[in-house]
Amino acid sequence: MQALLLEQQDGKTLASVQTLDESRLPEGDVTVDVHWSSLNYKDALAITGKGKIIRNFPMIPGIDFAGTVRTSEDPRFHAGQEVLLTGWGVGENHWGGLAEQARVKGDWLVAMPQGLDARKAMIIGTAGFTAMLCVMALEDAGVRPQDGEIVVTGASGGVGSTAVALLHKLGYQVVAVSGRESTHEYLKSLGASRVLPRDEFAESRPLEKQVWAGAIDTVGDKVLAKVLAQMNYGGCVAACGLAGGFTLPTTVMPFILRNVRLQGVDSVMTPPERRAQAWQRLVADLPESFYTQAAKEISLSEAPNFAEAIINNQIQGRTLVKVN
């Protein structure tokens, strides 16, 4: 099988496509023929060695994949069945999806929902799955379309752009925040009623004028602090990212004076039941136009160069890897 293998030499990460024997695949009860994978920011960090994502080498990256079951010792899955996988540390500490085959635990797989195929599943990927979990978190907190505007930070990224599309389809008024002016028209086409520049969120006081009924934050740091200070009474912020940094220079004021909820959202270890629910919702709630968005299709051998481009903020939209 062909695979993108990451090896370490003199402290540097080297990425190359190699032919490997299936016997080298890690332990697991289901072997999958991978048809499509994708390149996420986390994959790009791993492939370029820019982030300490991978501790053990050699490693096959790829935190998402979709394909058909080759062999299964898990009664829930049978040969020929279409499946997808996101998260669970695959592509980080267990060989991942940037290979013609992957062997994983059945618990980590999701049967392909009706109305979805492998390519569409990878257009959604971890980014879209995380966005759906954030929307569900706002719903669970009682945030409704009639309550007011929802702000989405880091809106031109994978999670943010999907969140904008989902919220718009569900009837919410969406305001997008993006540091890239070139993406403003794109965000409006996804459903944002207006787009604010990120530098408006640089500094904040402990409490500011109430503006937002809900928020999905992918940035962290000062941007998240500003959003918290501007939340309506009883509002909820779903926080899922740290594109701007992992610190949070806030105070207790929004929480104790405005009853604001800060809800963390993790997509890696989401329990199977919630996971399946989110994928069903994605099929139902994503507009068909979402799948026609800019999605670059590349081969395994092109992945290292595209990983570099993703790190340098040169790619808009999804990067799909056609594996088989």
From Swiss-Prot:
Question: Where in or outside the cell?
Answer: Cytoplasm
Q: What class of enzyme is it?
A: oxidoreductase
Query: Which EC number(s) are documented for this chain?
Result: 1.3.1.84
Keywords attached to this entry: Cytoplasm, NADP, Oxidoreductase
Q: Sorted alphabetically, which InterPro entries does this protein's record hold? A: Acrylyl-CoA_reductase_AcuI (IPR014188), ADH-like_C (IPR013149), ADH-like_N (IPR013154), GroES-like_sf (IPR011032), NAD(P)-bd_dom_sf (IPR036291), PKS_ER (IPR020843), Zn-ADH-like_protein (IPR051397)
For the null mutant, the annotation states: 100-fold increased sensitivity to acrylate, about 8-fold increased sensitivity to 3-hydroxypropionate. Acrylate is bacteriostatic, not bacteriocidal. Can be complemented by acuI from a number of other bacteria, including Rhodobacter sphaeroides strain 2.4.1 (AC Q3J6K9) and Ruegeria pomeyroi (AC Q5LS56).
Gene Ontology terms, MF aspect: acryloyl-CoA reductase (NADPH) activity; protein homodimerization activity
Q: Which reaction does it catalyse?
A: propanoyl-CoA + NADP(+) = acryloyl-CoA + NADPH + H(+)
**One cellular-component annotation, GO:** cytoplasm
Q: Which SMART domains match?
A: PKS_ER (SM00829)
Q: What does this protein do?
A: Probably catalyzes the NADPH-dependent reduction of acrylyl-CoA to propanoyl-CoA.
What else the UniProt entry mentions is: The zinc-binding residues of the alcohol dehydrogenase family are not conserved.
User: Protein name, please?
Assistant: Probable acrylyl-CoA reductase AcuI
